[in-house]
Amino acid sequence: MTAPSAPGGNRAPSRRALLTAAVATPAAGLAGALAADRPDPDPPADGKAPGAGPAPADGPTETESPDPPGDQAPFRPVLPSDGLVTNEYAFSRPDADDARHSRDWVVTSGSLLARWTFGWTGVPDGEPPGPGSALHTGSSVFRLVTRRRDFGDTAVRCWVYLRPPGATDRTPARDWDGGHLWLRYHSAQELYALSFRRRDGKVVLKRKHPAPGRPADEEGVYTTLATARHALGHDRWHQICGTVSGPRDGRVRITLSLNGRTVLDAEDEDPGRLVTAGGVGLRGDNTEMAFFGFTAGNHTGGRPRAEPPAEGTSR
C-alpha cells in the first residue's frame, strides 16, 4: 500500500489519517506508510503537548514521565514515536540482554508496537515473536497490562481502531474474537473483562476467577455479568470507557461506554467479586488493533450521564 497523498500537495497528512489508512491494509499497511515523510503529530484534544518525538538512532525508548505522586495518580502512558515497545519474548525472558522492556506495560502474549505514539498490535499471526518482533508478532493472542496494580475505583478511556477479525492455525475463529478491556487485573486468572467488540457483535462483561478447588495458576473460569448486542464498525476509530467502583453495600459496579453511550451497567455481588485494586489493560483475539489516548484515573462510581442504554443492556 502506498501512503495517502498529502492534502494540498505539500502538507503531510495527519498521523491519525495516515495510521487509519495504514492499518486498513493488513500486511503492507504500515510498512508502506513508513516510506512517507513522518507526519507531524495532531494536537491532542485536551490541548496538552503531544507525545514523544522521533526515536533516537539506537532504538526507540519511551519518554520518561514523572513518577506518580501516589496511589491512584492518573495514568497517562507515553509511547515512543516508532518501533517495538515490548513483547512476550521480554515477558518470558526478563533477563535476556536483547529483551525490550517498558516502564509502563507488560505484554504476556503478542507484541506491542508504536507508530507515531499510537499503540499497535502489529499484523496478528500465530507464531511466537523474537526479541524484536521482526518476523512474527504473535498478536493473534494479544495480552497487554499495566505494571501498576493500584487502580481501585477507576475509569479507563482510550480510542481504539480494529480490523475485522481473522484466524490462524493456532487460533481458529471464535465468537469472542475482537477487542476487550481489562479492569482490576490481579493475574491472568483473576480480572474483569469488558468485551467492546466481538466477532459475534455482542458486548459482554465477565469476571474471570480461579476455578474452585483448583490450583491458582490453572486457567480460570468466566462468569458473565452482563451482555448486550452492540456491534461497533470496523476500520474506524471508536472511543471506549470502562469503569469499576466499590464495593459499596457489598456490590462492585462496572460500566462500559462506547462513543459516549452506556452499553453495559452491572453490579457484581457474588462472593468472588473483585474488591481490591489491580492493573488495567487491553486484550485482542485474532484482531489487528491500534489505540491512543489511553488514560486511567479515579472514578467516583456515580451514575453516568442520562443516556439511554443500548437495547438489551443488562442492569
Which role does the model predict for each range below?
Residues 156-158, 235-247, 252-256:
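Short tryptophan-centered beta-strand motifs in secreted/extracellular beta-sheet-rich domains
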Residues 1-13, 24-28:
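N-terminal secretory signal peptides
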Residues 266-293:
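Flexible glycan-contacting loops in extracellular carbohydrate-active proteins
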Residues 129-213:
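Secretory/extracellular carbohydrate-interaction modules
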Residues 14-19:
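N-terminal export leaders
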Residues 62-109, 116, 305-313:
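Extracellular carbohydrate-recognition regions
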Residues 100-142:
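Short carbohydrate-recognition loop motifs
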Residues 213-239:
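Short, aromatic/His-centered strand-loop micro-motif at the edge of beta-sheets
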